[in-house]
Amino acid sequence: MKKLSFQQIILILQNYWQDYGCAILQPYDAHVGAGTFHPATVLRCLGTKPWFVAYVQPSRRPCDSRYGMHPNRMQHYYQFQVILKPSPDNIQDLYLKSLECLNLDLKTHDIRFVEDDWESPTLGASGLGWEVWCDGMEVSQFTYMQQVGGIECYPVACEITYGLERLALYIQGIDEVKELDWNGQIGEKALKYGEVDFEAERQFSKYNLEFADSEMLLRHFKDSGEQCERLVNVNLPMPAYDECLKASHYFNQLNALGVISVTERASYILRVRYLAKICCIKWLELSSE
């Protein structure tokens, strides 16, 4: 059986969850640290309206910059996110069937659900959940989203996050992300993951760790926070949330540079959490009118 390419894995997951009834959304056009930060998760997990969506989200974590030299850790990577609200009772079975659709043999791989309650300090979000391990490496995360922006979620939504690169390593049976088959072609049309993303990985690692201007980032963090508050005050929670995302990314960049002390780090996290909270409160207030 021919092994699935990286882009085929994405297409199969999209088709699988579309057949279940999910709307297939597009990635959010902002720098986010995970698929959870997409407003389709943060804002739409709030309120009582049912919400069934799935999407790919490119994600950035400056602290994971490794100049493209690490086999499976990068500052830029892809997640596949599924939100099911209200959460179905058979969610684990649905997930395992999605792995089978990806030709992952559940009999030869050790798939384990490891209890791991999830929390995002900057989003004020938390929930009960599990990490999903394949042969000892985390490839997915399940979370019953109980709180976002410090607000209780009712009904509780289930979030599934697939780590696409790590999952692809097992499906293709290789050890390094840069060697992943991206498009399933041969000859001059063939592309590996490294040919698509790893020059950017090298350059952004240098930027994140060596050349980012910390004074400029500090100014941007302050400005984004103030703009977020102004927009919330005029009933514009969605553009306000964009500013919250910017502040979160600036904080992550400052953290990667190592210019924030342990004490300062806590205050930055509290600031971003406050911004997320006021966006969520205003979103809920307007959507319930």
Swiss-Prot record:
Gene3D superfamilies: Bira Bifunctional Protein, Domain 2, Class II aaRS and biotin synthetases, domain 2
Keywords: Aminoacyl-tRNA synthetase, ATP-binding, Cytoplasm, Ligase, Nucleotide-binding, Protein biosynthesis
Gene Ontology CC: cytosol
Record-linked SUPFAM superfamilies: Class II aaRS and biotin synthetases
Family that this chain belongs to: Belongs to the class-II aminoacyl-tRNA synthetase family.
GO biological process terms on file: glycyl-tRNA aminoacylation
Keyword Repeat listed: no
HAMAP family for this protein: Gly_tRNA_synth_alpha
Gene (name only): glyQ
Name of the featured protein: Glycine--tRNA ligase alpha subunit
Molecular function terms, GO-annotated: ATP binding; glycine-tRNA ligase activity
Enzyme Commission code(s) on record: 6.1.1.14
Catalytic activity: tRNA(Gly) + glycine + ATP = glycyl-tRNA(Gly) + AMP + diphosphate
Subunit structure, interactors included: Tetramer of two alpha and two beta subunits.
Localization (cell): Cytoplasm
Pfam family, one: tRNA-synt_2e
